[in-house]
């Protein structure tokens, strides 16, 4: 009897972020990682939400274009933009800039836009969503902020604090519809998108998806 099992498309995470990869691994589903080659500079006059959504979609489509998959692929693109005092804030890159960020945000609120795109090459359809998270920082002595930075070196994250680690001690409150959005990959939104794309999240064994 011929094999009539409809196999799901290959799933790809379009990201170089180890944080997003770790989040996706929580789902226990097979996926590959391909880093997108993309200019992530915001466009003039672009809102934070528009920047995040544009880049999430561009990452997914750029990676999909490099994959030779006759049966199609599902590509996950994600981008996060943080705003403070009406301005986008990027990854600090250095200890000095990270400390300046944290000092300026003490007792204040920072808004994070975590955009997600699931691109289906079989239909050329892209599902997109922007999850907004509001984070209020505690007021702490500069010496403690400096000690935190030296302990966790969060120089590759916007806002200079890793909420999934010791950085949670810098925060007073987090308001979001998706607790994983702040780390960079909104899993509630993603699983909703995967279900809409008929991806078998609840296959009983990994072999069912092979």
From Swiss-Prot:
SUPFAM superfamilies: ITPase-like (SSF52972)
Annotated site (Important for substrate specificity): 19, 80, 164
Compartments reported by the entry: Cytoplasm
GO molecular function: nucleoside triphosphate diphosphatase activity
Documented EC number(s): 3.6.1.-
This protein's GO CC annotations: cytoplasm
Main location: cytoplasm
Top-rank taxon: Bacteria
Substrates-to-products reaction catalysed: N(7)-methyl-GTP + H2O = N(7)-methyl-GMP + diphosphate + H(+)
Cofactor(s) demanded: a divalent metal cation
Pfam family, any one: Maf
Active-site feature positions: 79
Gene3D superfamilies: 3.90.950.10
Class in the EC hierarchy, top level: hydrolase
Known role: Nucleoside triphosphate pyrophosphatase that hydrolyzes 7-methyl-GTP (m(7)GTP). May have a dual role in cell division arrest and in preventing the incorporation of modified nucleotides into cellular nucleic acids.
Family according to the record: Belongs to the Maf family. YceF subfamily.
PANTHER family, per the entry: BIFUNCTIONAL DTTP/UTP PYROPHOSPHATASE/METHYLTRANSFERASE PROTEIN-RELATED, BIFUNCTIONAL DTTP_UTP PYROPHOSPHATASE_METHYLTRANSFERASE PROTEIN-RELATED
Protein name: 7-methyl-GTP pyrophosphatase
